C-alpha cells in the first residue's frame, strides 16, 4: 500500500504483470505455484500481493479489453481458421529467442504451414544442440534451437538437417582480414592474437578512439561520415551508429548531424511525458489543483499551446515588438490568432505586482491601473482574465463537486482541449516541422493528439464511475503519459541509422560507429530494481517457474548482442 505513491512503482507492477503474461504464467498457475512450492515467507507474501493485483487486473479486463501480451494467445485460438497460414512458407529471421507464449503459437504454425524456416546466429564450430550454461556466447541461440526442437517433437513434425551458411571470410570479410579475425575470436575461449604481414595494413578496418564526452564522440563520427561519403563514395545507408545508451546519445544526434547535413534516423520510441501538449495538460490540472496559483497559470500560458485561450487581440493593428519576434526557422509561431507573448508578459507583470492568486481573484474584474498602463491596456488584461477563467470554470467545477465522476471530469478536460483548439495548433506545428524538413518532429506531432485522446477514452471506460481527487486523477494520467510512446518511421531510404545494441536490427552495414563503449554502459550495469530480485528469480526458477532473464543472465545476453553488433560491419568498425 505505501509503495503505491512511489515514483515508478506502477510501472514496475505493470512490467511484472506483462512479464507473467509473456511467459504464459496465468493467475491460476501462479496461485497453484504459491500453494505447492516451499518458498521463503518474504517471497511468498510478495508474490501473493502480485497475484492479488494480477487477478484483479485480468478480472477487470475480461470481456472488455485485451492486452498486447494476449494478442499471440488470441492468434493461437484462431490460427486454424486462417487461409493465409495454411500451407504457407514461414521464415523467422533475427529472432534471438522465443518466450513460452511464442513457443505455444509455434505449435500451431508448425502444423499449419507447409514449411517453417528459422535462422539463428551461431558459430559453425559450435555444437548446435549442446549448451553448457548461460555463460556461453551462443547460449541464446542454442536455447532457441532446443525450444523449437521440443515443439517440433510435441507436434510430431519432422526436422530437416540444419543448413549452415559459409563463413564470412569468403563473403562479407573478403577484403577485411582483421574484421574476419575478430569475428572468429571475439569472446571465444583460447582466442589468439592477430598477426599481420605489412604494418601499413595493420588493423586498417578497425579504429579505436578515446574522446572526452558523448558530444565529441558524435562530432568525430559526423566528420568521418562526411569524409567517407565524399571521398570514398559510401552512401548514408551503408553507415550506422550504435550505442548502449541511445537515450543519452540520441539527445545530441539531431543538433550535430544536422550541423553536418547528415540525414539520420534514430531507432527508438520516444517518451511523450515532456512533449508540449502533455506539458500543457499537466499545467491545466495543476491550475485546478493549486487554485490558479501564479506558477500554475503561467506554466499553462507559456506552454506554447495556450494562444487560443482568448480571441485575437483587438489592438492587433499595432506593430509587433521586433525583439519578441521568434526565429521562424527554428520554432513555429505560437502566438498567432490570439494571445501573444507580449500580452503574456504584461499579464504576468500585473499579476505579480498585484499579488493575484486564486480562482476567485480571476473571476472578478481587475480595476487597478498600473502607473505605466492605460485604460485600454486594463481592458485587454480583463478580457484575457475573463477568457482564462471562463474557459477553466467548467473543469474547476467538475473537480470541486464531491459527487462528480471521472467520466464527468474527463469530459470537461476534453471540452477544454477542444475549446482551446489544440488539435489544430498541433497540426499547424506538425506542418511547420514538415515544411522545414524535420520529419521526425512532424510525425511526433501527427501522433500525439490521438495518443492523448485514446488515453482519455481508456480512463473513462475503466474508471468512469469512480470519484477521485484532482491529485489522484493527475497521478493516473501521469502514469499513462509515462507509459505512452511515439514511434517514428525512417524518413527515407538513404539515412544513417542511430540505434541501440539490443533493439536495432541492422542489415548490409558496411561501416559501423560503436559509440559510448564505457564501463557501466557496455555492458550495462546490472539493474537492481524491480519487484522480484535476482535471487528470488533464481529461487523461482528452481521450482520450474520460468520468467525473463535476471541481472546475471542479462550480462551474458549483452555480451551476445555486443558480438552481434561488432561483427555487423563488412568493411570498417569504429569504437569510441
Model-derived features: positions:
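Polyanion-engaging groove/track-forming segments
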Residues: 1-576
Amino acid at each position: 500500500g505505501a509503495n503505491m505513491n512511489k515514483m515508478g512503482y506502477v510501472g514496475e507492477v505493470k512490467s511484472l504483470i506483462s512479464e507473467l503474461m509473456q511467459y504464459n504464467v496465468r493467475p491460476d498457475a501462479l496461485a497453484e505455484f504459491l500453494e505447492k512450492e516451499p518458498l521463503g515467507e518474504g517471497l511468498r507474501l510478495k508474490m501473493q500481493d502480485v497475484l492479488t493485483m494480477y487477478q484483479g487486473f485480468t478480472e477487470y479486463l475480461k470481456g472488455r479489453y485485451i492486452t498486447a501480451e494476449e494478442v499471440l494467445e488470441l492468434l493461437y485460438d484462431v490460427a486454424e481458421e486462417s487461409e493465409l497460414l495454411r500451407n504457407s512458407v514461414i521464415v523467422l529471421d533475427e529472432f534471438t529467442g522465443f518466450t513460452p507464449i511464442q513457443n505455444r503459437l509455434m505449435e500451431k504454425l508448425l502444423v499449419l504451414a507447409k514449411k517453417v524456416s528459422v535462422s539463428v546466429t551461431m558459430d559453425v564450430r559450435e555444437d548446435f544442440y549442446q549448451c553448457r550454461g548461460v555463460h556461453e556466447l551462443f547460449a541464446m541461440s542454442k536455447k532457441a534451437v532446443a525450444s523449437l526442437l521440443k515443439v517440433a517433437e510435441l507436434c510430431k513434425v519432422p526436422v530437416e538437417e540444419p543448413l549452415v551458411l559459409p563463413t564470412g571470410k569468403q563473403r562479407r570479410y573478403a577484403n577485411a582480414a582483421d574484421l574476419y579475425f575478430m569475428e572468429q575470436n571475439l569472446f571465444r575461449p583460447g582466442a589468439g592474437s592477430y598477426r599481420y604481414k605489412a604494418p601499413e595494413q595493420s588493423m586498417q578496418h578497425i579504429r579505436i578512439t578515446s574522446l572526452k564526452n558523448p558530444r565529441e564522440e558524435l562530432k568525430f563520427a559526423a566528420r568521418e561520415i562526411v569524409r567517407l561519403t565524399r571521398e570514398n563514395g559510401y552512401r548514408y545507408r551503408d553507415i550506422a551508429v550504435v550505442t548502449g545508451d541511445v537515450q543519452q546519445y540520441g539527445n545530441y544526434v539531431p543538433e550535430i548531424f544536422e550541423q553536418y547535413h547528415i540525414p539520420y534516423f534514430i531507432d527508438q520510441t520516444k517518451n511523450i511525458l515532456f512533449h508540449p501538449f502533455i506539458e500543457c495538460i499537466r499545467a491545466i490540472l495543476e491550475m485546478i489543483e493549486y487554485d490558479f496559483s501564479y506558477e500554475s497559470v503561467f506554466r499553462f500560458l507559456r506552454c506554447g499551446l495556450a494562444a487560443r485561450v482568448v480571441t485575437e487581440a483587438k489592438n492587433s493593428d499595432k506593430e509587433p515588438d521586433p525583439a519578441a519576434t521568434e526565429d521562424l526557422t527554428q520554432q513555429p509561431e505560437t502566438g498567432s490568432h490570439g494571445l501573444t507573448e507580449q500580452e503574456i508578459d504584461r499579464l504576468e507583470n500585473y499579476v505579480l505586482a498585484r499579488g493575484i492568486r486564486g480562482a476567485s481573484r480571476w473571476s472578478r474584474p481587475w480595476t487597478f491601473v498600473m502607473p505605466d498602463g492605460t485604460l485600454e491596456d486594463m481592458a485587454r488584461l480583463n478580457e484575457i482574465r475573463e477568457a482564462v477563467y471562463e474557459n477553466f470554470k467548467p473543469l474547476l467545477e467538475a473537480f470541486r463537486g464531491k459527487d462528480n465522476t471521472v467520466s464527468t471530469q474527463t469530459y470537461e478536460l476534453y471540452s477544454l482541449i477542444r475549446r482551446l483548439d489544440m488539435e489544430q495548433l498541433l497540426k499547424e506545428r506538425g506542418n511547420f516541422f514538415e515544411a522545414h524538413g524535420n520529419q521526425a518532429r512532424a510525425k511526433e506531432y501527427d501522433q500525439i493528439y490521438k495518443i492523448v485522446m485514446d488515453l482519455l477514452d481508456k480512463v473513462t471506460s475503466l474508471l468512469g464511475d469512480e470519484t477521485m481527487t484532482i491529485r489522484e486523477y493527475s497521478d493516473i494520467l501521469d502514469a499513462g503519459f509515462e507509459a505512452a510512446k511515439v514511434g517514428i518511421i525512417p524518413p527515407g531510404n538513404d539515412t544513417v541509422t542511430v540505434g541501440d545494441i539490443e533493439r536495432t536490427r541492422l542489415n548490409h552495414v558496411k561501416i559501423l560507429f560503436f559509440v559510448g563503449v564505457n564501463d557501466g554502459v557496455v555492458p550495462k550495469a546490472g539493474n537492481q530494481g524491480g519487484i522480484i530480485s535476482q535471487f528470488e528469480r533464481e529461487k523461482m526458477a528452481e521450482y520450474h517457474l520460468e520468467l525473463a532473464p535476471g541481472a546475471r543472465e542479462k550480462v551474458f545476453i549483452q555480451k551476445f548482442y555486443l558480438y552481434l553488433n561488432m561483427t555487423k560491419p563488412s568493411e570498417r568498425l569504429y569504437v569510441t
